[in-house]
């Protein structure tokens, strides 16, 4: 009778989608009776298991929705004097406090130096900390927003972008901007200014960004909001793609 009661309880847990709790309860039931914890301890174990399970699912969903270019982690980042990146700097950024302060990160450097990989790693770290992250190639994002104007989804997508705890804009400066793209970019930056963090990666030095935007008033507005509260990383050294075998950047 007790075994039947236990199985019914297990079925109810699964029916209520308490997957973590059900898995832990099943593990407890497989133990010898004299090793099974008392009811109060068991309840605490089951609740903890369910909490861990839901946090894990939430994190995995956030990582999937972010659509990172690379599956990267901060532990895999190569820090050296030659790269102009120290482990101390990386550790400070990895704690995520810049996100809480609404600060930006600008990662610049030549092609193949690991800009996108570093941005992906910081984004992945933010997801692990329970934050909402979105990763975009800037040219593709701006093209998508043009299409949104035609099908009526522009406002919805802009609101989603605005509310991300961390927005990553990769490939800044890779494609020229037209008037519509400049205005969309300005709106993105303005909506997030002083509230949410943005990571930008670019082959262009910051000194060239004004001419890249190519419209004085809009360039002034965008750059004032991006650069004012930005942590700058200029990666150096040879391309890491040449001799890379473990996708470690």
What is the meaning of each model-derived region?
Residues 1-11, 243-249:
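Intrinsically disordered, low-complexity and often Lys/Arg-enriched segments
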Residues 14, 18-69:
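Interdomain "pre-motor" coupling segment immediately N-terminal to P-loop NTPase/helicase cores
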Residues 56-108:
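Extended interfacial segments that mediate partner engagement and assembly in macromolecular machines
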Residues 85-163:
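Conserved P-loop
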Residues 166:
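Walker B motif beta-strand of ABC-family P-loop ATPases
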């Amino acid at each position: 009778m007790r075994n039947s009661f236990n199985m019914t309880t297990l079925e109810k847990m699964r029916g209520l989608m308490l997957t973590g709790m059900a898995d832990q309860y099943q593990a407890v039931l497989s133990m010898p009776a004299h090793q099974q914890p008392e009811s109060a301890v068991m309840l605490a174990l089951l609740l903890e298991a369910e909490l861990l399970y839901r946090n894990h699912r939430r994190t995995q969903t956030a990582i999937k929705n972010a659509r990172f270019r690379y599956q990267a982690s901060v532990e895999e980042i190569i820090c050296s004097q030659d790269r102009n990146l120290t482990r101390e700097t990386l550790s400070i950024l990895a704690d995520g406090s810049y996100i809480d302060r609404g600060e930006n990160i600008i990662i610049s450097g030549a092609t193949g130096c690991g800009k996108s990989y570093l941005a992906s790693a910081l984004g992945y770290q933010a997801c692990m900390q329970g934050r909402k992250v979105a990763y975009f190639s800037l040219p593709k994002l701006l093209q998508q927003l043009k299409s949104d104007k035609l099908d009526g989804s522009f406002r919805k997508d802009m609101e989603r972008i605005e509310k991300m705890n961390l927005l990553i804009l990769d490939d800044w400066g890779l494609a020229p901007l037209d008037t519509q793209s400049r205005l969309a970019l300005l709106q993105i930056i303005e909506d997030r200014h002083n509230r949410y963090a943005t990571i930008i990666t670019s082959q262009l030095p910051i000194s060239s960004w004004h001419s890249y935007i190519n419209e004085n008033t809009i360039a002034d507005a965008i750059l004032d909001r991006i650069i004012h509260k930005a942590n700058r990383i200029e990666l150096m050294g040879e391309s890491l793609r040449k001799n890379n075998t473990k996708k470690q950047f």
